[in-house]
């Protein structure tokens, strides 16, 4: 074997070894890259699941809030209708329950018999016993 052939054989063996080491390093690098991509994909999937859960919960909250506001608006509408239709009668009944006189045909200046009697008794007491008042 000539020297040139030996050098050529040695060079090709060195290249084969370098290629082998390079391919092993590339395989390790590729495996690490795939592992990191898998972890990143897993984290992205978890984030999307959390985001979807948040959006579903927010939708449910908005739905409950909307139903609540609708119910309140409906109650207010019925209360306004009831006060518009029955308000004067309810006011008159409340005044009568509180002890006020309520005569629909009165202009407010007429006194009932009991009121006149009470005024006369009060005037009489003040006239005869001024120190009491």
UniProtKB/Swiss-Prot annotation:
Primary localisation category: virion
Location(s), subcellular: Virion; Host cytoplasm
The entry's keywords: Capsid decoration protein, Capsid protein, Host cytoplasm, Virion
GO cellular component: host cell cytoplasm; viral capsid, decoration
Listed InterPro entries: Vesivirus_VP2
Pfam families, alphabetized: Vesi_VP2
Family affiliation: Belongs to the vesivirus VP2 protein family.
Function description: Minor structural protein that forms a portal-like structure at a unique three-fold axis of symmetry, following binding to the host receptor. The channel formed by VP2 may allow the delivery of the viral genome through the host endosomal membrane.
Miscellaneous comment in the UniProt entry for this protein: Translated by a ribosomal termination-reinitiation process from the bicistronic mRNA coding for VP1 and VP2.
Subunit field text: Homooligomer. The portal-like structure consists in 12 copies of VP2. Interacts with capsid protein VP1.
Comment field on protein domains: The N-terminus domain points away from the virion surface.
Protein name per its UniProtKB record: Minor capsid protein VP2
Species per Swiss-Prot/TrEMBL record: Canine calicivirus (strain 48)
